[in-house]
């Protein structure tokens, strides 16, 4: 059978053997996901904003519950799941070397600002590695190219601009929805793969 997209929930639960739970992780929505490699407790919030306590067992991924109820946030939910799953993959592959510092041995938080920061300076290598692996798993070249063919985008997009190239932009937007990712995340990945030359998503 043909595969057209990666489903992070299936990947985490069926392939990696992880448990996924959806809860409110912060008052202001600033924390999108968290996981740990060992047993420890974390603060979460009930629907009425009362503080609660959740016990992480080292094999659980917590995701902000708001991401699970808004279809417009599907791309962000999928990336959050795969980001936290990537931390667990690295720990499985390198159990004696990954997540052993005092900082990384605790809870790994994925924050809402993580995918929008403009800085090119990498300040946390484990977070950068998790982002990079998550993008590679969610958006492999073969699936992007298959999707580009299905949506009539050719072999490469020269310019992504909503105002000047609306037809291309609409097909691209449909592709990102089809692949279950945000338009920005797909643009970053396509640039890495040489499938997109310029994008004006921030300033059309």
Q: How would you describe each model-predicted region?
A:
Residues 1-204:
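Active-site hotspot residues in diverse enzymes, especially metal/ion-binding acidic/histidine motifs
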């Amino acid at each position: 059978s043909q595969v057209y997209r990666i489903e992070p929930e299936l990947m985490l639960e069926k392939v990696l053997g992880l448990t996924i739970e959806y809860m409110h992780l912060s008052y202001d929505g600033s924390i999108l996901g968290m996981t740990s490699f060992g047993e420890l407790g974390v603060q979460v919030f009930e629907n009425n904003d009362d503080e609660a306590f959740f016990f992480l067992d080292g094999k659980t991924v917590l995701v902000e519950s708001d991401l699970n109820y808004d279809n417009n946030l599907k791309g962000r939910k999928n990336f959050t799941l795969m980001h936290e799953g990537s931390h667990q993959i690295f720990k499985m592959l390198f159990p004696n070397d990954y997540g052993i510092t005092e900082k990384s041995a605790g809870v790994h938080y994925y924050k809402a600002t993580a995918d929008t920061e403009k800085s090119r300076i990498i300040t946390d290598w484990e977070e950068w590695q998790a982002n990079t692996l998550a993008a590679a798993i969610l958006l492999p070249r073969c699936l992007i190219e298959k999707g580009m063919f299905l949506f009539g985008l050719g072999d490469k997009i020269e310019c992504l601009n909503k105002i000047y190239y609306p037809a291309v932009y609409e097909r691209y937007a449909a592709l990102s929805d089809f692949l279950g990712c945000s338009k920005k995340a797909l643009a970053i990945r396509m640039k890495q793969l040489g499938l997109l030359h310029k994008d004006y998503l921030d300033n059309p």
